[in-house]
């Protein structure tokens, strides 16, 4: 018997003793609550008795109350739910450390996070993933990781800081709190990956087969896949997988029929839940394999809106029963991930408990993790120490400053037809357009009247110095530029602007900071944010400080630059995501995702 098994046996014996020996009592009783039973999908009056970290029983707990028992009388007015689980998210998208993300998310009822660190994996490889895994051990909530099997997502179409393959799996799958492989993006574009880079499929299957052999899960990533392509993706993932890139009811229905779990994404800029939930509200499908997830949330939204309570409330507003909606962030994800100790209120489970006053709006009053009160009335009541990352995961920006000329898109004549990425608000899918823009001095110029602006990606790891150039429509800028070292998923420096000069200044400010965000106008830096950890995360600001900083940068892009989309940095970052159709941009150029090809920006 190993040490963990021995410890579990001792704990279970102690719980049995407390229940059977009238001299022993609970440490905590939530009395007269309205218990949300996610197993039977019902609500009924009951007490919840807790001993140390574990639930003793759900029912009449009068006999378990002693002089030392903490009794919280909920007066028959408050609902008692299992703690919420975010099943797919990236700390890097929030620009926060795990500790600071937890500080913002725990008060809204989120007690478990399953994060995919493929952003820092792209930037730094195993070194970055291990550093993040180490932080999971010091926070009060439960944080698990699902690691990338491949970086970059599309070898040959983009440059990452480190190339992860199956050779890395025996190491990174055994880091602390790693429970599987994250989204299988390398086989998202199944048809063209099979046609042009079949070796990727071989390597991915080697990784997923190994992962399954040691009891790990594998997340899928199958945007717009149907039929044979979807079946091939599912088999490559190991026959049991999820997908968080489902954007239509039809996709959701087919994936559920294939036995997949569908993570209904509802984040800061990508909102697909309302489409996915139609599989239940219109088609009457069983919801046991539907799961709520955020994928990407900015600190400002976390501080303002909440976290998984906000997701649940939005699901309810689509016509789903509140208990069924809560199942989608408790028992459903716990079942998928094999997290048998959380997700339900039942004897022997961890006492991760949320007390709710308003079931429709998901107003959270108290949060317990492991039987300990950690948050009340929207505020943490326990301290989460600030976490500082080691120097080895900093200084990831190794490129040289750029000139305006290096970002220019060359063209001939007085006008040019340019291929233009069409931004779609609140989606990471894009459209593909062609516009005619003026040419001056052999350079294709921005056309603000058509909202057609130059966009570029600068390789930042010092591996090849490449720069990709194209045009984009949808930001509405009237002046200036903004750049960042966050650009999914290879995370090179991406920039958009109304002049090449301001674009170069923004890029160079990001380089100077060693990673971050910069907003400029008329040759002047208006605001910036340093992201020293992998060029993705700050360990210098707490969650509330970062929230205020991001809000100010958002204000600058709107007021000073004229940007018309909310969360502009997140929207910009996804224009480099080569696994999501139609056109994207990387350091290698303009990418036609559907044909797996680099295409010239000027027709």
From Swiss-Prot:
InterPro entries associated with the record: Adenine_deam (IPR006679), Adenine_deam_C (IPR026912), Amidohydro-rel (IPR006680), Metal-dep_hydrolase_composite (IPR011059), Metal_Hydrolase (IPR032466)
Name of the molecule in the record: Adenine deaminase 1
PANTHER family linked to this entry: ADENINE DEAMINASE, N-ACETYLGLUCOSAMINE-6-PHOSPHATE DEACETYLASE
Gene Ontology biological-process entries: adenine catabolic process
Enzyme Commission code(s) on record: 3.5.4.2
Leading EC class: hydrolase
Lineage: Bacteria, Bacillati, Bacillota, Clostridia, Thermoanaerobacterales
Record's catalysed reaction(s): adenine + H2O + H(+) = hypoxanthine + NH4(+)
Family to which the UniProt record says this protein belongs: Belongs to the metallo-dependent hydrolases superfamily. Adenine deaminase family.
Source species, domain of life: Bacteria
Family matches, as Pfam families: Adenine_deam_C (PF13382), Amidohydro_1 (PF01979)
Keywords, comma-separated and alphabetical: Hydrolase, Manganese
């Amino acid at each position: 018997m190993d040490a963990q098994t021995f410890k579990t046996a001792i704990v279970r014996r102690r719980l049995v003793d407390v229940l059977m020996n009238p001299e022993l009592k609970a440490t905590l009783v939530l009395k007269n609550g309205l218990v949300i039973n996610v197993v039977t999908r019902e609500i009924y009056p009951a007490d919840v008795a807790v001993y140390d970290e574990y639930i003793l029983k759900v029912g009449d707990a009068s006999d378990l109350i002693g002089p030392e028992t903490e009794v919280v009388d909920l007066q028959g007015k408050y609902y008692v739910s299992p703690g919420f689980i975010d099943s797919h998210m990236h700390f890097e998208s929030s620009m926060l450390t795990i500790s600071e993300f937890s500080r913002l998310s725990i008060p809204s009822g989120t007690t478990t996070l399953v994060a995919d660190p493929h952003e820092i994996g792209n930037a730094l490889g195993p070194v970055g993933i291990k550093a993040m895994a180490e932080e999971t051990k010091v926070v009060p909530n439960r944080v698990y990781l699902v690691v990338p099997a491949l970086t970059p997502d599309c070898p040959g179409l983009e440059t990452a800081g480190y190339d992860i393959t199956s050779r890395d799996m025996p190491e990174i799958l055994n880091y602390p709190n790693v429970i599987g492989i994250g989204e299988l993006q390398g086989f998202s574009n199944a048809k063209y990956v099979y046609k042009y880079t079949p070796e990727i499929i071989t390597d991915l299957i080697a990784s997923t087969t190994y992962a399954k052999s040691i009891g790990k899960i594998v997340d899928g990533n199958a945007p717009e896949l149907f039929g044979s392509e979807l079946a091939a993706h599912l088999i490559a993932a190991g026959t049991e997988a999820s997908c968080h890139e489902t954007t239509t009811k039809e996709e959701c229905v087919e994936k559920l029929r294939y036995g997949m779990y569908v993570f209904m994404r509802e984040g800061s800029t990508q909102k697909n839940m309302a489409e996915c939930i139609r599989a239940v509200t219109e088609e009457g499908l069983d919801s046991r394999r539907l799961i709520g997830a955020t994928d990407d949330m900015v600190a400002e939204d976390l501080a303002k809106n909440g976290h998984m309570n906000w997701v649940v409330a939005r699901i309810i507003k689509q016509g789903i029963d509140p208990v069924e909606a809560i199942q989608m962030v408790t028992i459903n994800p716990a079942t998928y991930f094999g997290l048998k100790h959380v997700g339900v209120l039942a004897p022997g489970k961890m006492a991760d408990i949320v007390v709710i006053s308003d079931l429709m709006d998901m107003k959270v009053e108290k949060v317990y993790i492991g039987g300990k009160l950690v948050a009340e009335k929207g505020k943490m009541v326990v301290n989460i120490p600030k976490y500082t990352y080691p120097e080895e995961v900093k200084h990831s920006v190794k490129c040289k400053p750029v000139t305006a000329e290096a970002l220019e898109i060359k063209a001939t004549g007085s006008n040019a037809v340019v291929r233009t990425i069409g931004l779609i608000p609140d989606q990471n899918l894009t459209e593909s357009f062609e516009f005619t823009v003026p040419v001056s001095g052999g350079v294709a110029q921005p056309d603000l009247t058509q909202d057609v602006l130059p966009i570029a990606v600068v390789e930042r790891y010092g591996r090849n110095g490449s720069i990709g150039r194209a045009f984009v429509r949808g930001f509405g800028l009237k002046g200036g530029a903004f750049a960042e070292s966050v650009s999914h998923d290879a995370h090179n420096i991406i920039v958009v602007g109304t002049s090449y000069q301001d674009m170069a200044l923004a890029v160079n400010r990001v380089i100077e900071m060693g990673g971050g965000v910069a907003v400029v106008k008329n040759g002047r830096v208006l605001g910036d944010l340093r992201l020293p950890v992998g060029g993705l995360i700050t360990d210098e600001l707490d969650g509330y400080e970062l929230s205020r900083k991001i809000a100010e940068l958002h204000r600058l892009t709107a007021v000073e630059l004229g940007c018309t989309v909310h969360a502009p940095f997140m929207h910009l970052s996804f224009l480099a995501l080569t696994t999501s159709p139609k056109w994207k941009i990387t350091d290698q150029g303009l990418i036609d995702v559907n044909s797996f090809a680099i295409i010239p920006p000027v027709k």
